[in-house]
Amino acid sequence: MLGITTLAALPLGNMLFIIIAFLLLMLILKKVAYGPLTKVLDERADKISSDIDGAEVARQEAEKLASQRQAELAETRQNATKVVNDAKASAQKQSDLIVSAANDRAASVSQQAQTDAQKLKEDAISGAKNDVAALSVAIASKLMQKELSLNDQQALIDAYISDLETK
């Protein structure tokens, strides 16, 4: 109750002076303390906001880089797969060429062997014919005790060969 009595005991002039002094003190505090304090708080809020915005931009940039890296990785894998497939195809093609060349060479060697065998057979038959003809002439000469002329010999050989061919 002391405060109420004191307030009522104050004269109006003192009360008016105290109110004006209080308002003046509030105005000075607003200019001196509140203004710089709000300025510091606003600057701090702006810095926090810009840091958040910067972090968001950095996050978006990181996501963008990550997606680029993923795309590059996929492209690299695709290129590597293509290189491997191309190498396999090239190796298969080269293998086919080597096999084809070997088959051609084998066919050529086989054909040459057949040709050589045929020639040897013909030479053997021809040699055998000549030997048989000479033997036949010798036997016939001995049997006949005379020597055949060249024409008679040839006729006898031809007859003997045709007789052999029919058998």
From Swiss-Prot:
Subcellular location: Cell membrane
Ranges that cross the membrane: 9-29
GO cellular component: plasma membrane; proton-transporting ATP synthase complex
GO molecular function, one term: proton-transporting ATPase activity, rotational mechanism
Principal localisation: membrane
Membrane topology: Single-pass membrane protein
Assigned keywords, A-Z: ATP synthesis, Cell membrane, CF(0), Hydrogen ion transport, Ion transport, Membrane, Transmembrane, Transmembrane helix, Transport
Entry-linked InterPro entries: ATP_synth_b/b'su_bac/chlpt, ATP_synth_F0_bsu_bac, ATP_synthase_B_chain
Membership in a protein family: Belongs to the ATPase B chain family.
NCBIfam families: ATP_synt_b (TIGR01144)
Function: F(1)F(0) ATP synthase produces ATP from ADP in the presence of a proton or sodium gradient. F-type ATPases consist of two structural domains, F(1) containing the extramembraneous catalytic core and F(0) containing the membrane proton channel, linked together by a central stalk and a peripheral stalk. During catalysis, ATP synthesis in the catalytic domain of F(1) is coupled via a rotary mechanism of the central stalk subunits to proton translocation. Component of the F(0) channel, it forms part of the peripheral stalk, linking F(1) to F(0).
Protein known as: ATP synthase subunit b
Protein's organism: Leuconostoc mesenteroides subsp. mesenteroides (strain ATCC 8293 / DSM 20343 / BCRC 11652 / CCM 1803 / JCM 6124 / NCDO 523 / NBRC 100496 / NCIMB 8023 / NCTC 12954 / NRRL B-1118 / 37Y)
Lineage: Bacteria, Bacillati, Bacillota, Bacilli, Lactobacillales
